[in-house]
């Protein structure tokens, strides 16, 4: 809404640039913008999408342009849109973009915005040297972390797997929870597919989601999960943030991420605001222990499943 107030209808050029680390986040922001019912045009640009189509769309300049850093650099170098009227730059999921190696592209873009009124809004979840990356001197920091981080509605429980292959433990956990849906996080694309296939063979309706899928496949998987056609989304950290996914009562860590930040984002899919949720960690004694995990947490014992969870209702997608 503050961005809306700053836009000027008489300026027929891009006035606000939003950089995002992924096309999914960009498309989500575009959808939210359109739901606001504003007359201001918005476009989204990202790698893997037809650049010719994007160039055609940008010939009638939007007031708000959303894009991944690499694709925005490409358009700037081609001179597809003017940068001299951009007054607001938003770096959404700024820390994620840095983790993905977009530092050089973001520096290039910021360097081109010479007439920027220094309205730089940064979204980050880790301790980042904001002035170093954004060229902003003495920025105003808005900290939304609760004063007492211990006051959380998230509980964590450990499921000890007897075997290195944790499929059996995951299956029994799902059946024990009797939950109609959950997100299962793993660390590798092939693992997401393997786990999904194994669960389906056991009668659990699941689908996988990862960065190796093309855009149509990924969107189809999300639609299936959102509308309840499948109950379990088996995914990499790609779904840990930046996606419009309903809040879950449970998230399950089949693998633990190497970084605590990603663990935090995964858990952010549950226990939002005043809601309660539980994160389950499936662990085997042979696995590397992570410094950020309290291995003395409550152990959740699962028995061999005797019945399957309620099957989802099939819907048209």
Task: Map each language-model feature to its residues.
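Conserved helicase RecA-like core
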Residues: 1-317
């Amino acid at each position: 809404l503050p961005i809306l107030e700053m836009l000027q209808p008489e300026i027929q050029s891009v006035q606000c640039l939003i950089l995002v680390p992924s096309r999914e986040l960009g498309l989500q922001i575009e959808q939210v913008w359109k739901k606001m019912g504003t007359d201001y045009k918005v476009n989204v640009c990202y790698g893997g999408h037809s650049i010719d189509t994007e160039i055609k769309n940008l010939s009638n300049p939007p007031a708000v342009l959303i894009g991944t850093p690499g694709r925005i650099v490409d358009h700037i170098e081609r001179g597809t849109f003017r940068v001299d009227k951009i007054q607001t730059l938003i770096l959404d999921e700024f820390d994620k973009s840095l983790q993905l190696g977009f530092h050089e592209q973001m520096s290039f873009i910021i360097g081109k915005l010479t007439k920027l009124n220094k309205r730089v809004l940064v979204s980050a979840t880790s301790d980042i040297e904001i002035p170093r990356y954004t060229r902003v001197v003495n920025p105003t920091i808005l900290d939304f972390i609760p004063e007492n981080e211990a006051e959380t509605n998230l509980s964590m429980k450990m499921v000890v797997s007897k075997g290195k292959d944790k499929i059996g433990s995951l299956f029994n956990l799902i059946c024990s929870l009797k939950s109609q849906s959950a997100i299962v996080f793993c660390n590798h694309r092939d693992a997401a597919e393997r786990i999904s296939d194994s669960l389906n063979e056991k009668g659990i309706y699941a689908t996988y989601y990862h960065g190796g899928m093309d855009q149509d496949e990924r969107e189809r998987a999300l639609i299936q999960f959102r509308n309840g056609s499948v109950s379990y989304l088996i995914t990499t950290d790609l779904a840990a943030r930046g996606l419009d996914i309903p809040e879950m009562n449970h998230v399950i860590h089949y693998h633990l991420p190497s970084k605590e930040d990603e663990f935090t984002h995964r858990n952010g899919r549950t226990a939002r605001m005043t809601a309660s949720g539980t994160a389950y960690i499936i662990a085997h004694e042979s696995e590397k222990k992570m410094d950020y995990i309290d291995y003395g947490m409550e152990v959740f014992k699962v028995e061999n499943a005797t019945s399957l969870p309620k099957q989802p209702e099939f819907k048209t997608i």
